[in-house]
Amino acid sequence: RRAGLLVALSEGFTPRPKISFGLALPTGAESVAEYVDIDLRPDISAADLGLDSLAGRRAFTEGLSAALPIGFDVVVVAERPAGAGSLQDSVTTCTWEFWHPRLTTEDHRRACQLMAADTLVIERERKGKLSTDDVRPLILDLFTKFAGSDIAAGREGDGSVLVADLSTVGRGLRLSEFAELAYPGHDARDVRAMRTHQWTEGPDGRREVLDAPDADLAVAGPAGIAPLAEAPA
């Protein structure tokens, strides 16, 4: 309402704005950016919002950012194709960075050895009963790197991080469960995690849910908008 968007409403006795965020961010985790779906009224087109030109899209993102709380900025907006599923359902993989001041590059390298395991069985509690699950198929890739200088400056430690591609299909793997596997001997609750990418599978392979450079050049049409908003760390 503050941004002047004519948002579509759900049906029923208590209509609600059709606004939905993508894959939920786990409690305590950080994120580089998040996605949100905003359904517009059927009589509103992208051209009505000025989204059919580069200048119009820039003006739109600036205006929407100004209506958001301090620390949140809309960086790109694009059409969500008519009939497309929800953002949460489309995400199949997330890329994470894990670090802690007491974790070293060698700790991260040892964690990468999980890729060599055939199985990784953990115990989970369901409805008061313990069960076992093999979570090895959920760990798609692991490698270590040094964070960029702008990020490392705000972190204690040697600046190294573990980068993990984790599947979101099915029940998924909790960050705490992964941290316990990756860093035995360390308290998993102390391990920091930042989501850097959300991926979806398409005919051309894996791609970002919303690719910023492509979206900025695309001609938007009716249906809805899917802005990517930066979340504060």
Regions found by a protein language model. Give the residues of each.
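Short glycine-/aliphatic-rich beta-strand segments at the starts of folded cytosolic domains
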Residues: 1, 36-38, 90-100
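Short, intrinsically disordered, mixed-charge
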Residues: 1-8, 62-70, 116-120, 180-187
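Short, charge-patterned binding micro-sites
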Residues: 7-43, 82
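Core RNA-modification/binding signature centered on pseudouridine synthases
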Residues: 16, 113-233
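Glycine-rich, charged/polar anion/phosphate-binding loops
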Residues: 23, 78-86, 125-129, 138-141
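Ordered, amphipathic secondary-structure segments that act as subunit-interaction surfaces
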Residues: 32-91
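Short beta-strand-to-loop capping motifs
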Residues: 38-44, 98-103, 164-168
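Short, conserved charged micro-motifs
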Residues: 44-62, 102-115, 170-177
